[in-house]
């Protein structure tokens, strides 16, 4: 069987100067097919390759469960892949920092009426900050991951771009990558479709070639976010009132604000209303869930905080994604942007379901300009 073009030209995917035989590549290995293929591509370059896996949470109860990143079986899979490729492999216990930086923050955000994205927090902390430090300690020339994004050299240095395969693009989750980190990171899969990734895994004889993709949220085994929040913050189930945002009328009682998010319609248990009602906002101090008709979800602008900018601001129109699966929409950026500053984005058309706690990620074409956390929104006033 002839080698795939990616394997034949593997060295070009890592963009390292000098002979590859003199280079050391650390690969972040989760045990899934994507990071396993990255390890295989790295090994094909002739460089010294070291696989590193982070144990991020107590996976005992989840052992044998499919669809979770870095659970017990995944660590064993990563080790088996490393053995197959003939590379070193290390597992580091980061359970304590992961719980503090990601899981507890996840629970606190829900308690404060926000809709968190723990995968972004994880990328900002354990997956990049901690792994990069380890890679440097191991004397690596770069850290390679299985994310579907592209690192493209621009006039001012490396830029973060969307993946070639839009169905696999993960750039939304990596907006917090710093310029210093991007200089050291490599994303060999950003130019490949998922189908080719699996073909490479088969060609390399990796047992994970047909392994299902992992979930985004690894520490929620069954999708029951409320259960996870309760386990960390038992007070999350405190009941409160469901209030009509326009009239102030109390329509019912809820089971705890952790069960609700902006834009939600189902599960409100307030039947008999003259029109469909949606969650418009969450008032955490008073434990109130505010509901209203769909037009009340229309947002004109959003304030974003803790912003990160990757490279200079372009002299080009900007678009923004306010949810991971949303389409980018035109925006105008106001205020300082980057280095933790707060800014505002204004939408050219009403945007619906913009939830505090989510990320707003800015793009110029395929380039990721940066982003920040949505802190508050301004309603679009619809005339008539």
Swiss-Prot record:
Organismal lineage: Bacteria, Pseudomonadati, Pseudomonadota, Alphaproteobacteria, Sphingomonadales
UniProt KW Nucleotide-binding keyword: yes
Keyword Transferase among UniProt keywords: yes
Known function: Catalyzes the 2-thiolation of uridine at the wobble position (U34) of tRNA, leading to the formation of s(2)U34.
Reactions mediated catalytically: S-sulfanyl-L-cysteinyl-[protein] + uridine(34) in tRNA + AH2 + ATP = 2-thiouridine(34) in tRNA + L-cysteinyl-[protein] + A + AMP + diphosphate + H(+)
GO cellular component: cytoplasm
Protein name: tRNA-specific 2-thiouridylase MnmA
GO molecular function: ATP binding; tRNA binding; tRNA-uridine 2-sulfurtransferase activity
The protein's enzyme class: transferase
Pfam assignment, any one: tRNA_Me_trans_C
């Amino acid at each position: 069987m002839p080698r795939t073009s990616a394997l034949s030209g593997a060295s070009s995917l890592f963009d390292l100067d000098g002979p590859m035989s003199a280079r050391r590549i650390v690969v972040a290995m989760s045990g899934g097919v994507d990071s396993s293929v990255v390890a295989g591509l790295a090994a094909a370059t002739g460089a010294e390759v070291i696989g590193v896996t982070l144990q991020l949470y107590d996976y005992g109860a989840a052992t044998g469960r499919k669809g979770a990143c870095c659970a017990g079986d995944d660590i064993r899979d990563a080790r088996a892949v490393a053995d197959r490729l003939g590379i070193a492999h290390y597992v580091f216990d980061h359970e304590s920092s992961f719980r503090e930086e990601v899981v507890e923050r996840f629970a606190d955000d829900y308690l404060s009426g926000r809709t968190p994205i723990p995968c972004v927090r994880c990328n900002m902390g354990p997956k990049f900050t901690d792994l990069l430090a380890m890679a440097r300690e191991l004397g690596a020339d770069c850290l390679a991951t299985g994310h579907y994004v592209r690192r493209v050299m621009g006039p001012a240095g490396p830029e973060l771009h969307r993946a070639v395969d839009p169905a696999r693009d993960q750039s939304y989750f990596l907006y917090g990558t710093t310029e210093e980190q991007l200089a050291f990171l490599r994303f060999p899969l950003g130019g490949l479709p998922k189908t080719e990734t699996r073909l490479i895994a088969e060609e390399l004889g990796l047992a994970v070639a047909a392994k299902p993709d992992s979930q985004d949220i690894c520490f929620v085994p069954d999708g029951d976010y409320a259960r996870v929040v309760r386990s960390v913050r038992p007070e999350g189930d405190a009941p409160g009132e469901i209030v009509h945002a326009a009239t102030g009328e109390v329509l019912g009682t809820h089971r705890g604000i952790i069960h609700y998010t902006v834009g939600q319609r189902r599960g409100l248990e307030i039947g008999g209303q003259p029109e469909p009602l949606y969650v418009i906002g969450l008032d955490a101090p008073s434990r109130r869930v505010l509901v209203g008709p769909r037009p009340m979800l229309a947002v004109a602008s959003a304030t974003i905080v803790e912003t990160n900018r990757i490279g200079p601001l372009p002299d080009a129109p900007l678009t923004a994604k306010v949810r991971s699966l949303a389409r980018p929409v035109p925006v105008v950026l106001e205020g300082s942007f980057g280095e933790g500053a707060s800014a505002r984005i204004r939408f050219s058309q009403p945007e619906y379901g913009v939830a505090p706690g989510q990320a707003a990620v800015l793009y110029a074409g395929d380039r990721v300009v940066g982003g920040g956390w949505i802190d508050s929104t301004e309603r679009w006033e619809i005339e008539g």
